[in-house]
Regions:
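Active-site gating/metal-coordination segments in enzymes
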Residues: 32-82, 103-106, 111
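Alpha-helix-loop-beta-strand connector modules within alpha/beta enzyme cores
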Residues: 16-34, 71-93, 129, 133-138
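Short acidic active-site motifs
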Residues: 42-46, 99-101, 121-125, 262-265
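Acidic, glycine-enriched loop/beta-strand segments at the rims
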Residues: 196, 224, 242-247, 256-292
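Divalent metal-dependent hydrolysis catalytic cores, especially in the metallo-beta-lactamase
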Residues: 1-13, 25-33, 53-66, 90, ...
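Active-site neighborhoods of metal-dependent hydrolases
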Residues: 38, 45-68, 116-239
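Loop/turn elements at helix/coil->beta-strand transitions in domains of secreted/extracellular proteins
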Residues: 23-27, 53-57, 85-90, 108, ...
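Divalent metal-coordination and catalytic microenvironments
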Residues: 28, 54, 84, 94, ...
Length: 304
């Protein structure tokens, strides 16, 4: 699990204790606090603070939340990226708009942490991504979570989902007043439209050879870890990727994108034996990723 932001001390302790052959839980890599500096000087200081925490990557937000907040200006995000690179750290960027994506790439960003959702990507953006071999993490289920609770999702009756979710959370999300509020939310409907753009952009970028890393933005309330990852692969296939491409984006290429491919991502000698055993072929039907027989971490069977 690669957490892109606001990780607490316990997360770093978990990360620092995971390089052991006896590990029987998920691996964790962490970005620490998401940086939101107000000046160039503060940008440098916050980067230095995160580096002192020994974060795995630096995370920033370049987004105005659909026009409701101020966006980090280019001089400041460039200062973050430059300082991070001086200290040997890569930078992941939360964004929404195509022009911001181009701007952060110009500034040297290393990882695009969400889909471009305001418009279709163009040839110039694709060329920038490929020239620097920057990875793109679509987080399609993040968009789904912003509007789907305007009604009761079908998966609320899935036994696999219900096995691990807090029933109180389900009841809250099924409240008629809450669903009506989301249905009438202009922001939710904007993100719903953004999902269609995100789907097209994922397919276009994948076809062009841009490296894709599966991610979901799970963790916040109503973004269900584990289950949303399974749904993300299904969403990627619905967007036009093959089952094989979605699986590679979730394993080998995700590891490559985070510079972890010497440890995980494929089953090879001298790497950790982290893998899932399924009861059906996901290449034949991507929904077969739900048919889990066993999970192994470092070759150890995880108690499920």
């Amino acid at each position: 699990m690669y957490s892109l932001g606001d990780d607490q001390e316990a997360g770093f302790k978990a990360r620092d204790s995971q390089n052991t052959p006896s590990l029987d839980r998920a691996r964790l890599f962490a970005a620490g606090p998401v940086l939101a500096p107000k000046s160039v000087d503060e940008a440098k200081k916050l980067v230095d603070d995160n580096v002192a925490m020994n974060v795995d990557i630096i995370k920033i937000r370049v987004d105005d939340n659909l026009g409701t907040t101020a966006k980090m200006p280019p001089d400041i995000y460039k200062a973050v990226i430059d300082e991070a690179h001086r200290k040997g750290k890569r930078v992941a960027v939360h964004l929404f708009y195509l022009e911001d994506a181009k701007g952060v790439l110009d500034a040297g960003a290393d990882f695009i942490a969400h889909s471009v959702r305001d418009k279709d990507v163009d040839d110039a953006f694709i060329a920038m991504m490929k020239r620097r071999n920057v990875c793109y993490c679509p987080t399609l289920m993040r968009e789904v979570s912003t509007f789907v609770y305007e009604s009761t999702p079908s998966w609320f009756s899935d036994p696999l989902f219900l096995k691990h979710v807090d029933p109180k959370t389900i009841e809250q999300l099924k409240e008629p007043a809450r669903q009506e509020q989301m249905k009438n939310s202009k922001q939710a409907q904007r993100y719903k439209a953004g999902l269609e753009v995100a789907n097209r952009n994922l397919k276009k970028l994948s076809d062009a050879g841009v490296p894709i890393a599966m991610g979901t933005d799970t963790g916040p309330p109503a973004r269900f870890q584990g289950y949303f990852e399974q749904m993300e692969l299904e969403m990627m296939v619905k967007a036009g990727l093959t089952s094989r491409q979605s699986l590679i984006a979730s394993t080998r290429d995700a590891a490559r994108c985070q510079k972890l491919d010497d440890q995980v991502g494929t089953l090879e000698p001298n790497k950790w034996a982290d893998f899932v055993v399924l009861n059906a072929d996901p290449l034949a039907d991507i929904s077969n990723i739900r048919k889990i027989d066993a999970v192994y971490v470092a070759g150890n069977k995880v108690d499920r």
